[in-house]
């Protein structure tokens, strides 16, 4: 997903949040897709083993409003169709990757249509600001009522990573809350290595207090199609460092839509700010040939790798306290 974060960030603060519409009340439980005392059954069954109860995970889901024919700039959080889609897709297949690393919180928010990124001056900016202001309000409510000083993992994908990057800049970067940052997982967007003033790109698997990011593409795809990633921050979500290559046997597993885990499925190769992967080895690999890139799978493709790494970082953070 291509856009200028610097521009978006500047526009956000120049706007003075003047474009925000009616605020969402996050004291209402139904305005949360996930809280630790209200995990949907479809999500609960994805959790494997024990959970770190001294760490929280604040998760923000990716863009689901993709239909070019849909005229809406934002989704109302009471839209039953999208609520069900959120619960049964990104909550189930993405957020679950962090379920063992801490207590999960995920707000419903009025996310922006995908067109917002390419039309900042023609409605896109206001659309993204509405979405971010919801995420921001939910995060403030979370801090004031739920967190109680625990470590914090920020996790998201695509548009979710957009909003989390702004939370990092507004609430963590050089602020007191930075001491509670376990890690920020913000894949699916292009970030600079120096995107934040005091929050580093983490290049060790047990490192804490920083961020990790990546964008996944097909290995045989014409690399010119991903040229906008050139020079962007990237780590290998199999090795959790900047190693340029990881063989299939190091891949811990990706979660497919049939809820099955496929291990040792592909090689990963870092080049020009992108994680290039070989065609996954699994029973439905023919589906991969129809895809131009694997953006939609930035989390699912590395689900078990993320799960294990998030547990490791939570453990490392708690040992340092």
Q: Which ranges hold each PLM region?
A:
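Bacterial Sec-dependent N-terminal signal peptides
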Residues: 1-20
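Flexible, membrane-associating and regulatory peripheral segments of lipid-active enzymes
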Residues: 17-87, 91
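Loop/turn elements at helix/coil->beta-strand transitions in domains of secreted/extracellular proteins
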Residues: 53-55, 100-104, 148-151, 178-182
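Structural recognition of the beta-strand scaffold that forms the well-ordered cores
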Residues: 56-60, 105-108, 153-154, 183-186, ...
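Active-site catalytic motif of lipid deacylating hydrolases and related acyltransferases
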Residues: 61-149, 282-300, 304, 311-321
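Surface cap/lid and interfacial helix-loop subdomains adjacent to catalytic sites
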Residues: 131-148, 170-316, 320-321
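Gly/Ala-rich beta-loop-alpha elbow adjacent to hydrolase catalytic centers
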Residues: 156-160, 164
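Short, hydrophobic alpha-helix immediately C-terminal to the catalytic nucleophile
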Residues: 165-169
């Amino acid at each position: 997903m291509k856009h200028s974060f610097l521009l978006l960030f500047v526009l956000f603060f120049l706007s003075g949040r003047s474009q925000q519409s009616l605020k969402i009340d996050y004291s209402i439980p139904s305005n949360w897709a996930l809280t630790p005392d209200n995990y949907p059954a479809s999500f609960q069954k994805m959790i494997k083993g024990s959970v770190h109860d001294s760490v929280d995970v604040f998760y923000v889901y990716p863009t689901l409003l993709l239909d070019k024919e849909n005229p809406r700039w934002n989704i109302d959080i009471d839209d039953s169709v999208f609520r069900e889609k959120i619960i049964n897709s990104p909550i189930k297949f993405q957020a679950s990757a962090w379920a063992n690393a801490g207590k999960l919180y995920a707000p419903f928010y009025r996310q922006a249509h995908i067109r917002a990124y390419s039309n900042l001056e023609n409605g896109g900016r206001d659309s993204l600001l509405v979405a971010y202001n919801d995420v921001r309000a939910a995060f403030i409510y979370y801090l004031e009522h739920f967190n109680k000083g625990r470590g914090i993992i920020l996790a998201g994908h695509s548009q979710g990573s957009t909003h989390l990057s702004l939370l990092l800049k507004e609430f963590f970067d050089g602020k007191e809350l930075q001491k509670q940052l376990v890690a920020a997982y913000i894949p699916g967007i292009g970030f600079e290595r120096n995107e934040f003033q005091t929050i580093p790109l983490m290049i060790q698997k047990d490192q804490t207090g920083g961020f990790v990011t990546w964008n996944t593409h097909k290995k045989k795809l014409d690399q010119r199609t991903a040229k906008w990633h050139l020079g962007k921050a990237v780590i290998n979500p199999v090795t959790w460092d900047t190693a340029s290559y990881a063989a299939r046997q190091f891949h811990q597993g990706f979660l497919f839509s049939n809820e099955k885990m496929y291990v040792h499925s592909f090689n990963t190769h870092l080049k020009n700010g992108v994680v290039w992967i070989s065609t996954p080895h699994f029973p439905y690999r023919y589906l991969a040939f129809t895809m131009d890139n694997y953006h939609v799978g930035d989390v699912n493709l590395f689900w078990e790798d993320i799960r294990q790494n998030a547990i490791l970082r939570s453990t490392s953070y708690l040992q340092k306290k």
